[in-house]
């Protein structure tokens, strides 16, 4: 059956690639094959693959993920027949670079209130930690009890499997609530036990709250820079934010700090007036 092939392939990807890349490639391949059944990869027609990839994957990044995932699948099982590189390229160049999104506004205080009102402490701690650490949701889901350290009223988080291999130890922004609650939470878990829910579940629950998980990382970048600017030069503050975000280039960090399609406000004035 299909998943007798795909599940071992998933393990193969994780053994060959960084976790985030493996996750992206597998998700794309799994999406492609979602509505078909097969017992062997040689049963899949390469023309069907070409047409289905063209229809299902709208942006260049999405198309690249499924193309590279399929190439890895062929490495894993040579029975798979793929379109030629020229055929892949002919489709790729017609894809737009990214989905067009309307400008959005992130409201800090309403986001914090939504998180603080959560009755599930695992979700509440996870989302608050994301706001003060800048962790991606995949990194948050991977955290074990031994990855969090609290010293001298400071919280440190160790990321072992960051995007692009950029892990490291991160000093979190001050949060007196987490400084008090996390030690009590950590002692309930073994050192190698996952602290929070899966990435899929964290995203799902955030969506139900009306929050995008990556907005918590954006909040971290902006609030950290604003706080640091009061103590040092703008250049020094920018460098520290880049380091804590674990970006190889400041041009990546700039997309969080100076994105013209993104507005950052402390309060939703309309929401406050309506209340």
Descriptions of predicted regions:
Residues 94-122:
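Long, amphipathic, Lys/Arg-enriched alpha-helical "connector/arm" segment
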Residues 6-99:
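N-terminal core-binding DNA-recognition domain of tyrosine recombinases/integrases
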Residues 143-179:
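Conserved tyrosine-mediated DNA breakage-rejoining catalytic core shared by Y-recombinases
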Residues 173-220, 225-227:
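Active-site/catalytic core of tyrosine-dependent DNA strand-transfer enzymes
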Residues 124-138:
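Short pre-functional
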Residues 245-271, 275:
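Catalytic-site neighborhood detector that most strongly recognizes the C-terminal catalytic loop/helix
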Residues 140, 216-232, 241-242, 253:
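Short, basic/aromatic-rich helical patch in the C-terminal catalytic core of site-specific tyrosine
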């Amino acid at each position: 059956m299909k998943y007798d092939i795909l599940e071992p392939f998933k393990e193969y990807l994780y053994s060959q690639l960084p976790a985030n890349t493996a996750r992206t490639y597998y998700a794309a391949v799994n999406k492609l094959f979602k509505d078909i059944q097969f017992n062997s990869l040689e049963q899949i027609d390469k023309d069907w693959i070409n047409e289905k990839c063209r229809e299902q994957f709208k942006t260049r990044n999405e198309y690249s993920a499924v193309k590279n995932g399929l190439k890895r699948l062929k490495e894993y099982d040579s029975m798979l027949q793929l379109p030629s590189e020229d055929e892949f390229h002919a489709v790729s160049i017609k894809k737009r670079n990214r989905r067009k999104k309307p400008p959005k506004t992130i409201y800090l205080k309403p986001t914090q209130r939504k998180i603080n009102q959560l009755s599930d402490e695992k979700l509440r701690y996870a989302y608050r930690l994301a706001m003060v650490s800048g962790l991606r949701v995949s990194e948050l889901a991977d955290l074990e009890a031994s990855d969090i350290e609290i010293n001298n009223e400071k919280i440190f988080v160790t990321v072992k499997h960051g995007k692009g291999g950029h892990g490291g130890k991160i000093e979190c922004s001050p949060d007196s609530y987490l400084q008090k609650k996390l030690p009590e939470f950590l002692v309930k878990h073994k050192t190698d036990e996952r602290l929070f829910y899966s990435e899929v579940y964290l995203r799902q629950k955030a969506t139900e709250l009306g929050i995008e998980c990556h907005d918590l990382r954006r909040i971290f970048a902006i609030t950290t820079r604003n706080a640091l600017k009061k103590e040092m030069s703008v250049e020094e503050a920018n460098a520290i934010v880049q380091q804590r975000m674990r970006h190889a280039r400041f041009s990546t960090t700039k997309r969080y700090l100076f994105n013209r399609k993104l507005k950052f406000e402390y309060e939703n004035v309309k929401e406050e007036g309506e209340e």
